[in-house]
Regions:
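Extended alpha-helical, oligomerization-prone segments that build pores/tubes and scaffolds
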Residues: 1-595
Length: 595
């Protein structure tokens, strides 16, 4: 067995401490997941309903509200912006904007974004994870991002920043089988000549429960979560191993070099500074006092990856922000935010209880109880059998008295209106309304009023979107930092726009157009940009309303036909514009010939 690394023991101890600290949040979040999946009742509640001959199927208003909220927030992909800090860098802003869109496309950004919003809504916390895929592009690598299940991430419980910037560290746990690890790291299949074992066989396995918590409610629906299927495979190679990626902050030296003659300033890391010190010309300038050198300490993120008792690898990421970007929902100034499901669970339980009472009353009304005087019927069981036969003749002794049917009291109209009121409160808390779901009865009579109401109805969703856009902006900054260090070779970025136009830029290619781009990737002082997200870019828009506005502007002469045509759903916009140009040219030629 390989000897344990001291650093690994420290990381495992932190994992245990931070996991224990979030145990209460984990239980509540798992209960939220159960509610989303339709498992609203505990085992005792389900058994009680079955004893009453009532179904344990809830009237699940919460699910539809969550799905509608997700549809509104993720209607369209976000639009990134890159604002240069200096006027000289303005020509490269579109390059960075294209790179961010390119990374979004190759990372399946639309699907990933929707899953993050799902976790954000259900558990209260979603995660983006930016990384470099070393195998992509035939080994040249690509900067990508994905989503992370919130149960796989543990955070320093002392963090108070919304994006956990003040946390001493973050940990990402992944449970692999033996075969999965060998696929990812073939080096682990190498045989130790001393004992004849593969390296992976000398690594400690993982014998604890999955990082995904177990349910607390009865599984009334056919939902198969990771805690359910974790033991389905018992064959060869199914042994479990825990891989922990530990992200921590360290200080890295950088050097700010100023040329006192020209006023130019550059910033170099230690490796480039050592190369610069070997330059004789630079040494002469430094000896003459013409160069000012200042060492500064900058925060960078260190990644330490452990497997069992060994350190698999570790390196420093050229970013001052954690590559794991949280998307907290109802912020509580801790790493344990609340979710929309948790905020509305009591309303859903109330709705289930009201429906149970209504169902119980319906059962009592449809199956009337029969009260018989004692001794008037000889065989009660025979009476119960004959009672179900509409043509049966039943004998009884009237001297004991007449049979009696006690009728239940009718339900009040206020009770019957309770479900609608509860559904309204759930929609109100989620910031969605029936009109936004296509309910014609809740819509105004005119189209203009409907569009205005739809716009007003999205204000709650837009408020929550502001918080989500903050996390998207943070993700863009991390991608910017990783891409700036990674894309140091010649590469072409192509992105197809929604109007079928193609944006194409080549980096690290020296010609009149993009010679400065290569300098941007090699020099940290050139090309500093502030990455942002265009507000409301992911929200749905009313295309009929937009088209009417553009048509009015076109008819008023405020815009040309090209701008108006780009807002339509016509597929071949470029072809239409080309044919219109040809027609106009022919008309001009005909007019000139007639003159």
């Amino acid at each position: 067995m390989i000897k344990a690394n001291k650093n690994v023991e420290h990381i495992k101890e932190l994992w245990r401490r931070w996991s224990d600290a979030r145990k209460d949040w984990e239980d509540d979040a798992r209960d939220d997941v159960d509610f989303y999946l339709g498992n609203h009742f505990s085992e005792a509640e389900r058994d009680e309903l079955e004893s009453r001959n009532q179904s344990s199927v809830p009237l699940d208003r919460l699910y539809s509200a969550i799905e509608q909220f997700k549809a509104i927030i993720t209607s369209k992909p976000p639009k990134f912006s890159a604002v240069p800090r200096e006027d000289s860098d303005s020509k490269l802003a579109n390059v960075w904007k294209t790179i961010l869109e390119y990374v979004w496309d190759i990372s399946d950004g639309n699907e990933t974004f929707k899953q993050v919003i799902h976790d954000y809504t259900v558990t209260g916390l979603g995660y983006f994870y930016a990384y470099v895929d070393r195998e992509a592009d035939y080994g040249r690598g690509e900067v990508k991002f994905t989503y992370i299940d919130p149960f796989r991430v543990v955070i320093d419980p002392n963090a108070r920043n919304r994006w956990f910037d003040d946390a001493t560290g973050m940990m990402l746990s992944t449970i692999f089988t033996k075969f999965q690890l060998l696929d990812l790291y073939p080096q682990l299949s190498e045989v130790n000549e001393e004992n004849g074992k593969m390296l992976i066989d000398e690594i400690e396995g993982y014998r604890e429960d999955e990082t995904y918590p177990s349910p607390r409610n009865a599984r009334t629906k056919g939902s198969y979560t990771p805690d359910v299927v974790k033991d389905y495979d018992h064959g060869e190679g199914s042994e479990k191993y825990q891989l922990i990626e530990y992200f921590s902050k360290i200080k890295v030296p950088y050097y700010r070099i100023a040329n006192l003659q020209s006023g130019d300033e550059r910033i170099l890391d230690k490796a480039n500074m050592d190369k610069m010190m070997e330059n004789d010309e630079f040494k002469d300038l430094a000896n003459q006092g013409l160069v000012d050198i200042v060492e500064v300490q900058q925060t960078r993120i260190k990644l330490t990856c452990t497997l069992g008792q060994i350190v698999l690898y570790e390196y420093i990421l050229n970013t001052d922000k954690y590559p794991i970007v949280p998307v907290p929902n109802i912020w509580t100034n801790t790493p344990y935010p609340m979710s929309d499901v948790r905020k509305n669970k009591d309303f859903q339980r109330y709705l289930n209880k009201v429906m149970s009472l209504i169902t119980s009353h319906a059962q009592a009304s449809s199956g009337l109880k029969l009260l018989l005087p004692q001794g008037s019927v000889d065989d009660i069981e025979e009476l119960e059998r004959d009672w179900a036969n509409p043509n049966a003749t039943i004998e009884y002794d009237p001297s004991f008295g007449e049979p009696h049917f006690p009728s239940p009291q009718p339900l009040s109209n206020s009770v019957m209106s309770l479900p609608q009121m509860i559904e309204h409160y759930i929609d109100l808390n989620m910031g969605i309304f029936e009109m936004q779901q296509g309910n014609a009865e809740a819509a105004p009579r005119t189209s203009s009023a409907t569009m205005m109401m739809e716009d007003f109805g999205q204000r709650r969703s837009k408020s929550k979107l502001r918080d989500v856009e903050g996390s998207l902006k943070r993700l863009g900054k991390v991608i910017y930092n990783l891409a700036k260090e990674h894309y140091t070779y010649q590469k072409t970025f192509r992105v197809v726009q929604p109007n079928n136009d193609m944006s194409e830029y080549m980096v690290n290619f020296y010609d009149d157009k993009s010679s400065a781009i290569g300098e941007m990737f090699n020099d940290l002082t050139i090309g500093q940009y502030d990455v942002g997200v265009v507000g409301n870019s992911t929200m749905p828009s009313n295309r009929w309303g937009e088209w009417s506005i553009y048509m009015e502007a076109y008819q008023s002469g405020l815009i040309d036909q090209t701008e108006a045509l780009m807002k339509t759903d016509i597929f071949d916009k470029e072809g239409v514009l080309q044919r219109m140009d040809i027609v106009q040219q022919l008309q001009q030629q005909l007019q000139q010939a007639q003159e």
